[in-house]
Amino acid sequence: MKKYIILLILSGFIITSSFAQEEEPSSDPVYAPFESGILIDQQTGVIPDARTLEFIIQHKFGSMDNGRSDLWGIYSPGANVRLALNYVPINNLQIGAGITKKNMYSDVNAKWTVFEQTDDNSMPVAVTLYGVAAIDGRNESAFGTGKVVETKGEALPASVSFSDRLSYFSQLLIGRKFTDWFSLQAGASFTHYNMVGWDYNHDVVGAHAGGRIKFSPQSSIIFNYDQPVKIESISEQTDWDTFAKANFSVGLEIATYTHAFQIYAGSANGILPQDMMMY
């Protein structure tokens, strides 16, 4: 009888230990901190699996200022669209290229998730670096060159070189999935345009925040906020008349296994991040 009791106790200990081991959090990356690599106007730390090719469509209607006469922006002028392809050559590294209607931008971009948040909190946040270089493809006559020939601020009518058309955006993002239904991220960015109008700054520093509140397995409320920061020490202007306004957007995300659809309203017409930070 004692043998059986000892065996039962040992068996119970082994079973209990195995269950305890299974319940311990692993050092694996957390599952789906966001449903997509894009959160309205921002990036996230999400990058698809290696050797994934991703097609992106981003579309914005015009201003809602005229209300129902323009069907709240659907018929109003100023619509913007971007088509892009992203490819993931290795895990946690994504490269891409796209074209945008506004300013006829062509862009190349890269995103690297340096650290992923883990289940056991050995890495409590995800850290991501993102960068974009874009070319303004408009005709020379569309440019305000910013090349001042008189103190009145008159600019040369043309003389736009290839390098004048270039703009850059770099960003650091830190995000965390707090629960299965709530994720939040914050970031800082630097924007540079090689050439701008005489009344603009070439450089803009930005602060960013965004998040997701999930209310069903496929649906979430999403939001983002982008704030150009006024820094007098790097400003080339004496006032802030042309300084970009903050961008706030809120919307609904519906996700499937392979797609994420986002419907939202926001205050920025631009799609490329440097365009939103500058204009």
Give residue spans per PLM region.
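Transmembrane beta-barrel domains of Gram-negative outer membranes and organellar outer membranes
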Residues: 21-160, 166-170, 178, 182, ...
